[in-house]
Amino acid sequence: MNNLYIFHYHYIKGGVSTVVRNIVKSLKDAYKITLFGSKKMGIDGIEEVLSYENVDFIDFPELGYIYYDSTDYKTFLELKESIKNKLNNYHDERAIYWAHNYNLGKNPAFTEAFKEFITTKNIPTIIQIHDFPECARWENYSFIRKFINSSLYPIRKNIQYATINLSDYNRLIKCGIPSENAFYLPNAVEFAKNKDKIDDIDKDEVINKLKKLGYNVDPTNKNILYPTRTIRRKNILEAVLINRLYGKSNLLVTLPANSDKERPYEKVVKETFESEKVKGAWAISAKDPSLFPYILNISDLFFSSSVLEGFGMIYLESKFNEKNFLTRKLDVIEDFKNIKEISYYDRFLVSLSPKEINKVKEKYEEQINKIPISEENKNHLRQDLNNKFDKDLIDFSFLPVELQKKFCMEEEAKLNDLKEINKEIFDKIEMLTSTNHIDQGINLEDFSLKAYKSKIFLLLDKVQARGNAPKGVQGSTKEIEDTIIDENILKSFLTIDNIRLLFSY
């Protein structure tokens, strides 16, 4: 039985840990699997699979996050050397090495040590990309480029780049990674029906419970569920304003923030929900976690105004729970080839005065000047800024949070024109909340563990066949290490969408 070595900074509960659990479940009978990561950072996201017979965890403290301000070049080199020595201790030429988010800028010493290790040893390797630092994570980007000037994407026969969505798969190929070195591996999702029988739940009873908890909900309204944590990229104030303009629904948001960085945004969202003008309930599960299945049951629509997602979980959740959904149109929609047009909206427009537009543009100019990229690349962003702000109607998600809140608190008479401007959104909400579960083009089987397992074996066959091939055999891949790939990836993210003022609040 061959070894599979999996690397990530930590295994805290979250997206990457879910993926790792699914990898382990799919391969536990075919490989001896060892998970490497920082125990100190957390491993609660993988505890479930550590009981399997062929699965081990090895504490690798050096893989934990490091930080820009506390890492000088000497520290970087010492840490890199320590990581390389450990990797050499676990060198197995028959093993497959699988690293997650090695490019993210959370530990540049690991990034460079791992890259040098797999290229010099010619090890069959999967580098799975969940996120890019160039996508709204400029601190990470600056950190990784503080120490690494070479390409993060070496092209070798032994290296496969796996992405969790089709958009990023196409991005890699457009940016210069050969298709034979790229693999599309969408996440698997496992759902379990609630064991408690709740079909006969009385909607009025649930609404009364919410009222007793202090929420401003109307029992005659429809219920729009936004199942999310209160984090900036979820763009929750947009959902608040859309709900307010629709005027016939309660907006139900499930969770508060989960990190200190999100607390200022959480405070604004909390204050907005406390207004009498807003019908709904915020952070329900923090007040009473037992209510969630009942909230789910009485919901008439799943909704998301999120502006950044790596995976379309909400589409699968809504399908599983037999609920209709409406979301912002994001790149992850490409993963759902049959999704219906009624399922999403492109933008939510609000009217700004020329003075307000200039103020917002000034804030973006300040933002652009802070980003650690060339002046030429900054000019790409300035051009995009001018294009997106050349009319008096601006996408709500581009506004600073303070201005978003102001719109949410505005007198109703001043908001009426927004209903007509965004009529298509409200027509969709009306239809989706007035009909029972309709076919919106989502197939759960495409994202089942069974489908995932078959894709993983295709990926492993590919990396083993190409990695073990003699030079000059197995396709046309040349050994390339060219920063033009990195530059192209950077340019692919140079839009105002990725430096929204929302992200830096």
Curated annotation (Swiss-Prot):
Gene3D superfamilies: Glycogen Phosphorylase B. Keywords: Glycosyltransferase, Transferase. The keyword Disulfide bond does not apply. Optimum pH is 9.0 (at 60 degrees Celsius). Its EC number is 2.4.1.270. It catalyses: (2R)-2-O-(alpha-D-glucopyranosyl)-3-phospho-glycerate + GDP-alpha-D-mannose = (2R)-2-O-[alpha-D-mannopyranosyl-(1->2)-alpha-D-glucopyranosyl]-3-phospho-glycerate + GDP + H(+). Optimum temperature is 90 degrees Celsius. Not strictly dependent on divalent cations, but the presence of Mn(2+), Ca(2+), Mg(2+) or Co(2+) stimulates activity. One of its GO terms (molecular function) is glycosyltransferase activity. Involved in the biosynthesis of the compatible solute mannosylglucosylglycerate through a phosphorylating pathway. Catalyzes the conversion of glucosyl-3-phosphoglycerate (GPG) to mannosylglucosyl-3-phosphoglycerate (MGPG). Monomer in solution. This is Mannosylglucosyl-3-phosphoglycerate synthase. It comes from Petrotoga mobilis (strain DSM 10674 / SJ95). The gene is mggA.
